[in-house]
Curated annotation (Swiss-Prot):
Disulfide bonds: none annotated. Residues 1488-1525 form a coiled coil. GO terms for biological process: cell morphogenesis; central nervous system neuron axonogenesis; ephrin receptor signaling pathway; neurofilament cytoskeleton organization; regulation of Rho protein signal transduction; regulation of small GTPase mediated signal transduction. Residues 849-1044 form the DH domain. Homooligomer; forms cytoplasmic aggregates. Forms a complex with MAPK8 and MAPK8IP1. Interacts with RHOA. Interacts with microtubules. Interacts with YWHAE and YWHAH. Interacts with PTK2/FAK1. Interacts with NEFL. Interacts with CTNND2; prevents interaction with RHOA. GO terms for cellular component: cytosol; plasma membrane. Keywords: Cell membrane, Coiled coil, Cytoplasm, Differentiation, Guanine-nucleotide releasing factor, Membrane, Metal-binding, Phosphoprotein, RNA-binding, Zinc, Zinc-finger. It comes from Homo sapiens (Human). This is Rho guanine nucleotide exchange factor 28. Residues 1496-1527 are annotated as: RNA-binding. Functions as a RHOA-specific guanine nucleotide exchange factor regulating signaling pathways downstream of integrins and growth factor receptors. Functions in axonal branching, synapse formation and dendritic morphogenesis. Also functions in focal adhesion formation, cell motility and B-lymphocytes activation. May regulate NEFL expression and aggregation and play a role in apoptosis. Residues 1295-1304 are annotated as: Interaction with PTK2/FAK1. Phosphorylated on tyrosine upon stimulation of cells by laminin. It comes from the Eukaryota.
Amino acid sequence: MELSCSEAPLYGQMMIYAKFDKNVYLPEDAEFYFTYDGSHQRHVMIAERIEDNVLQSSVPGHGLQETVTVSVCLCSEGYSPVTMGSGSVTYVDNMACRLARLLVTQANRLTACSHQTLLTPFALTAGALPALDEELVLALTHLELPLEWTVLGSSSLEVSSHRESLLHLAMRWGLAKLSQFFLCLPGGVQALALPNEEGATPLDLALREGHSKLVEDVTNFQGRWSPSFSRVQLSEEASLHYIHSSETLTLTLNHTAEHLLEADIKLFRKYFWDRAFLVKAFEPEARPEERTAMPSSGAETEEEIKNSVSSRSAAEKEDIKRVKSLVVQHNEHEDQHSLDLDRSFDILKKSKPPSTLLAAGRLSDMLNGGDEVYANCMVIDQVGDLDISYINIEGITATTSPESRGCTLWPQSSKHTLPTETSPSVYPLSENVEGTAHTEAQQSFMSPSSSCASNLNLSFGWHGFEKEQSHLKKRSSSLDALDADSEGEGHSEPSHICYTPGSQSSSRTGIPSGDELDSFETNTEPDFNISRAESLPLSSNLQSKESLLSGVRSRSYSCSSPKISLGKTRLVRELTVCSSSEEQRAYSLSEPPRENRIQEEEWDKYIIPAKSESEKYKVSRTFSFLMNRMTSPRNKSKTKSKDAKDKEKLNRHQFAPGTFSGVLQCLVCDKTLLGKESLQCSNCNANVHKGCKDAAPACTKKFQEKYNKNKPQTILGNSSFRDIPQPGLSLHPSSSVPVGLPTGRRETVGQVHPLSRSVPGTTLESFRRSATSLESESDHNSCRSRSHSDELLQSMGSSPSTESFIMEDVVDSSLWSDLSSDAQEFEAESWSLVVDPSFCNRQEKDVIKRQDVIFELMQTEMHHIQTLFIMSEIFRKGMKEELQLDHSTVDKIFPCLDELLEIHRHFFYSMKERRQESCAGSDRNFVIDRIGDILVQQFSEENASKMKKIYGEFCCHHKEAVNLFKELQQNKKFQNFIKLRNSNLLARRRGIPECILLVTQRITKYPVLVERILQYTKERTEEHKDLRKALCLIKDMIATVDLKVNEYEKNQKWLEILNKIENKTYTKLKNGHVFRKQALMSEERTLLYDGLVYWKTATGRFKDILALLLTDVLLFLQEKDQKYIFAAVDQKPSVISLQKLIAREVANEERGMFLISASSAGPEMYEIHTNSKEERNNWMRRIQQAVESCPEEKGGRTSESDEDKRKAEARVAKIQQCQEILTNQDQQICAYLEEKLHIYAELGELSGFEDVHLEPHLLIKPDPGEPPQAASLLAAALKEAESLQVAVKASQMGAVSQSCEDSCGDSVLADTLSSHDVPGSPTASLVTGGREGRGCSDVDPGIQGVVTDLAVSDAGEKVECRNFPGSSQSEIIQAIQNLTRLLYSLQAALTIQDSHIEIHRLVLQQQEGLSLGHSILRGGPLQDQKSRDADRQHEELANVHQLQHQLQQEQRRWLRRCEQQQRAQATRESWLQERERECQSQEELLLRSRGELDLQLQEYQHSLERLREGQRLVEREQARMRAQQSLLGHWKHGRQRSLPAVLLPGGPEVMELNRSESLCHENSFFINEALVQMSFNTFNKLNPSVIHQDATYPTTQSHSDLVRTSEHQVDLKVDPSQPSNVSHKLWTAAGSGHQILPFHESSKDSCKNDLDTSHTESPTPHDSNSHRPQLQAFITEAKLNLPTRTMTRQDGETGDGAKENIVYL
């Protein structure tokens, strides 16, 4: 394929032509598309054929300046797009694009002179701009202008009263199209009246420049100019571009790597054929009357439409706007659905049972018009209400208006109109204004699915429209496949509705007829995805989501059996075809889910069919009911044992344990099947329980076989067949369909499957012939066709075919039906079992065996075709359509599959045809006499070459296909797909690896079968000769395939080894050349043999070596770090040329061999050992063969060329010798000059100038590589001379005595300049030019540094000289020394340069003389040889330049990578610094926290020490208290009896007597019991807690222990203000555990301890109770031993009588 252009501007819009070779055939009925694939965008455009092999298209605009791949794709009906050829086009940024961008960016900064300054960068004049007028408009149109941009600049800027605009600029230039373009942009009208800085408007400027025609055009321009470019954004990644001038449509998609080319082309075709959408989307805004409505009536004129549009109300217009916005949303969702075809499934699964109110009105209307009735039911509360909102969701259009049927697909509605009598009015009468508005808007916004279904693929009853319609059907035959889901799973084609003129009768009334309701309903039939239900574009006037879904979902029922037992509902593949009669109307049928069936009683209330129909349906329903009752679980158990044997005979099922992917039901009991308890019939695919198999109905296998033999092969689902008008028949499932079908297969019953893309042409022709016959029959007798359809429906409903049960959508029905019929013919084991026994007995034994082998050959060939069919239709098609895998990936798994199918199918049909010819009076009995000629024809000439090529490629990629399959199996989705396909009975439990293996093994079966046939064939016959020839051909084919596989495996192994070889490894050859990995990558080198050998070193060790025998060399490699490197053993080269290579055995080693290389560079010998003697011999044999077949060295030299080579080498040696001599002389000159400098330095020191810095070295070093640069030295010398002159003048002004020295200095300077032959003006000019132009860029860095130092020192000296006129002689001497050093260095540099120049001149002279001598002395073949050598040198030079260029590019890339790494390193360094600062701040915070914690820890330790000290004090105090208590206890026991107590009657006092007093008195001891009680009471009142804490005695205990003289206690009133020493002494004597201190005194004991209960712990109960027994014993003893007397006394103070009980001791 050749393209007419290789470059295009960024905005495109130029014609491109693709020319194909003459041998390339372009089908006439195919569509061609141009695709432009860039790095980020893909463009799809349609192409037009202008010649037989030339296609024309337009180049679209592109976003990047890059090279795109242009491909031409062919699309034909039923096939995937095929790439015909490809090329490349480079998008360039031309002058118009650059100028357009400049105008957009400079819109805010225009001045009165901008029309001249803007053209300066482009070197344009005002006269050349008119040629760029249109290109500028296209470039500006292609640019994406900012949102706030206007012609006046940014809208945010204030518009001044005088400013220049882009319109002024365009009018100055006189560009008419650009001016009109700016006028249509925002701000264009304001710019027309805006004066510029000079006060001139754009029109004034145009008149001033002489563009009067432009002024006239702009004056007459009223904004009607339509833009040349329109765009509709379909989604985030897809958009449509329409060029109005060329009328070209482009689909642009971003991120091309995520989309398949086939899906993108389908998306483009979808919108390209949806002309109604294109007209509404891309129609210019200047024509609103054409965009508002699309009238389908030819009677209405354009003015009527305008009037009707203008007469609409505001509410109607607002509704139309809402509908338009709804359609835009719909298109976005629909495009996203087309881009992602993976996520769709049926929403009808969840639909609710519709109301039956609609059925009465609809069915009563429908039953009056036809014999066969199919009803589509949906929820409508009132039949006469037209208030149904327009809904357009995911390609579904719901309408109540019949105008949708007449909607056309053409942009110009006036060109294609319908007849008046068949077209309804555009705006029907309705009382509901909103419904009318929706209907009107809906008329112009038909969805693609509904419009295409009603206009393209149906046979209309309008004869006047057939001519124009046929053209459209031809070009959009596959549109249905686009509207439906293209995945091929779970979806079907949209329903097609036929309309007749009679169906339009009720279109002008307010109440819709059944046809209108049917149009509403059927338009909701096409693909509806629940995955989009969350993002439905619902407007404000739509109903809720629940009512919407229930309204859109359609369900259909057959009047013959409303109770259809079907599983999961899909969109039904069906065809409804119109008959020629106006009264016949067919309605589409869809299958309802089982759980949503309408009950029979409710349905029958509203259906009143004719008598015959009613009786027929009644019988059908009764039969269905009885069958369900008979197969119920209750009756099944009763009849199980009785009818087991009869059922066994009748059923003839072949049950086997089944595997199911989903939830299935039993055919008998309708219960869920479990894996272990389920059985599946291999014939009819019926699923039952193990216990229900006896009650299963009869197998339908035999009925289907009989039907398959008699039925016509008409497949109605093919796209090519849809173009043909069909008779008035409709397909619907019957009620007797078995319930136990799998969910994925139930919907296939009664449906028609579409053809696959691989249907051969003969099958299509047979389909067309059958369709034509059906059409002719329908034209002559419609009743006959209907009766035929009844028989067809009954046969398909009552006895569905085996293939219908087990076949899924991915399988082509026609091909599988042919294969199944062939399988039935060859299902027997041998030929003797196929023919009649009597016929077989009449044949000879050899004939029978020969026929058995021939039958086996045909049978295995048929099985092989089935295997290929499984691979193609079950696995490959599903991968492409369901998994959406890339076609290249699928082709890697199934290489050459279509070619294999074609070859083997042709071979099988040839043998089958020979079988038909060999029938002996009966179809069953046959004897094949000749089979050899078919075998010879199959395996010879063209067929043999095809089979060798195809099988060679298939077998070569066998391992790759299996490995790729295993890699894909890691994906969960792919695993589920394979499991589902393997469970299919068609796959016969064969996976993809098994199928691939069977295909590779097929060709190895032919020799065995042919040899057996040959064994039983008579010799010296033609058949025997053919069989022998065929056997040889088969073996030759197998050998060729085997050779191809071996070569391919060797190449793959060689590539693997090359990939493992280290890139930097190399080895040196004997001739000194370096052999690298790149030298191995030659296409001429192929791998002949390889293996592991052992290289014996000089020390006797063995090295493991990988030996590779190539076509011209023998290579030794070593493995290192999982990489291969050239072997390095004994410093011998590891690459041996096969030229003059000899292999010899080692004398005493049967596993060793010597490899002797007798090359001209030098002989070399290698000792190689192998694992065995056989391997050694094999290596020697293969090396000998390789040496014999080794190609000769390229460019073999003759003796004369060798002599020339020696002469050339001699000349080169001589030149090198001269160069060495010159170099030595230069070095000597440099040494002499340095010696002179050293002498000058010594003289300076001897003269007494010690402060002068003298450097005795030159500023250059003699380098033989590159000559030194002298320009910088010369410049420095001139500067030094100037500084010396300044110093001498300064010294002359300072002292007269120095004049002699000054003159001497000048003479020295002059002598120095003259002695060294400093060049005059040419050198000065050279230095000046060098300084001005290049600076010191070419100067050696060391020289430049030294010269810079000298210049700085000289500058300081000059300043010093100027400041101090009396400069010393040392400064002058320093300047002279520097100047001398520079001049000597300059002299050395010039000498070295002269040497280099002489060497180069000598080399050039030698080359010129050599070429001249060759041209004079030699000619003929030698001259040709020299020219070839020169060409080769030129090529090598070009290669060197190319390598240099690549090196430079690599350096630039490396520099960029370094910069990126530096930036990344800087970023990371800043981040690390920031992180370090954060860490430091956190560390400081932690240190502060640690200090605070340390302080807290110290405080805590101090507190803990204080607590411990207090605890120790408390313990010591407790010990002291316990000691005191013990002392008191001892003291109490010792002193208790000698301490009597007397209670005086005058008050509550207890007197303690001294020991002497107690002895002097009557030894009496008195205890006042009342006093003790009083003390306890007082103590309890003051502080009762102490008593409980101290565990004192209760009063009751004291009462019981003391002896009472009176039963009544006497209450004593004690004054609390007086101290009670008595109680104190008393309780002190009783013990410390029983003390109660007076609470009015200080609460401290004798040791000043606080006794407050809140601070001091009380003694433990044990301590207090320990002394109680002692006190009791003491009192008891006193009671018993001492006499008692009672004493009564009156209390004088209180006057109250009180009794006291006193005990006298």
